[in-house]
UniProtKB/Swiss-Prot annotation:
It holds the Pfam family NADHdh. Its main location: membrane. This is NADH-quinone oxidoreductase subunit H 1. It comes from the Bacteria. It catalyses: a quinone + NADH + 5 H(+)(in) = a quinol + NAD(+) + 4 H(+)(out). One of its GO terms (cellular component) is respiratory chain complex I. It is found in: Cell inner membrane.
Length: 348
């Protein structure tokens, strides 16, 4: 472990590759089995069984679905912009995965004398000789949140279909409306932690001092606005089947369609991980489980809540969606910032 490459110890590169592989496999498996879990959970909530045929209680259903989509015919509409049509699913999928780069999923561990944070993104401090957390984690996530929608808009435009275009335009309008409220909702967290570092925000929530208790309104607003940003029910207007056939992905098939599907669920996992980090104490929990296990448990609980919401609430009408974002959520976030600022000023 004493070898160096480009002035950095080999342990830095080894740990980086290991963390990338672990996180990628975790997100991929979670996405695959979230589709299965959603069908089973909604099925039981509606007094049905859900998938039962493929494997024991349908446990192999995600594999069967993946194989089916992989071997289906790739169809590109004759009037479509082929290059944009093919690249749109990639633009939608990649930001959903790389958002995990800055999320800390456990406590710092020590290997061969080096302290390694359980977080992919970081830089090697040559003075201390340790991997240090970047102080821009939240800004990185907010920036990525607005990139995925470009893939959806591009898919709608390049398909040369009115239904796809309407779905893409709805997605962009929805993202603008709710990203503003979501960003303002977490300003109160910055005011309490006095940092943009996710490591620092998690550290401030130790011993049960979770920000969801100190900032319940911000927690609820951020979670709901995030669901609207990623087009989850009841905010799935961009792909409303009763109005737009299948919205922005109407003309897609095979693995291109699967990539949009994966992007939706990967975004859901990322939103739940960010919410866990900002409001639910991150990896903090009772000592009988390691920190990373608590982090995963909280993320899976929020994923279950997302599925519960889908099974419970009907889809909003488009004008109701816009009114809720601009006339209800945005003023509430501003009021919450003002009240938090007053409280912080009085305490200091």
């Amino acid at each position: 472990m004493g070898y160096e490459l480009f002035g950095l110890p080999m342990i830095y590169y080894i740990s980086m590759v290991a963390k990338v592989l672990v996180v990628f496999v975790f997100v991929l498996l979670t996405v695959a089995y979230a589709t299965y879990a959603e069908r089973k959970i909604i099925g039981h909530m509606q007094v049905r069984l859900g998938p039962m045929r493929t494997g024991w209680h349908g446990l192999l259903q995600p594999i069967a679905d993946g194989l089916k989509l992989f071997f289906k015919e790739e169809i590109v509409p004759s009037q479509a912009d082929k290059f944009a049509f093919l690249i749109a699913p990639i633009i939608a999928l990649v930001p959903a995965f790389i958002g995990f780069a800055v999320i800390p999923f456990g406590e710092t561990i020590e290997v061969a004398g080096y302290k390694i944070p359980l977080q992919i993104a970081g830089y090697y401090d040559t003075v201390s000789g340790q991997v240090v957390d970047m102080n821009v984690g939240v800004l990185y996530i907010l920036a990525l949140a607005s990139i995925g929608v470009y893939g959806i808009v591009l898919a709608g435009w390049s398909s040369n279909s009115k239904y796809s275009l309407l779905g893409g335009l709805r997605s962009s309008a929805q993202m603008i409306s709710y990203e503003l409220a979501a960003g303002l909702a977490i300003i109160s967290v910055f005011m309490l932690s006095e940092s943009l570092s996710l490591q620092k925000i998690v550290a401030d929530q130790a011993n049960g001092a979770w920000y969801c208790f100190k900032q319940p309104l911000a927690f609820i607003l951020f979670f709901i606005c995030s669901l609207a940003e990623i087009n989850r029910t009841p905010f799935d207007l961009p792909e409303a089947e009763t109005e737009l056939v299948s919205g922005f992905c109407t003309e897609y098939s095979s693995m291109k369609y699967a990539m949009f599907f994966m992007a939706e669920y990967a975004n859901m996992v990322t939103v739940c991980a960010v919410t866990t980090t900002l409001f639910l104490g991150g990896w903090h929990g009772p000592a009988f489980l390691p920190g990373w296990a608590w982090f995963i448990a909280k993320v899976y609980f929020l994923i279950f809540v997302c599925m519960w919401i889908r099974a419970t609430y009907p889809r909003y009408r488009y004008d109701q969606l816009m009114r809720l974002g601009w006339k209800v959520f945005l003023p509430l976030t501003l009021v919450n910032i003002i009240v938090t600022g007053i409280v912080v000023s009085l305490q200091s």
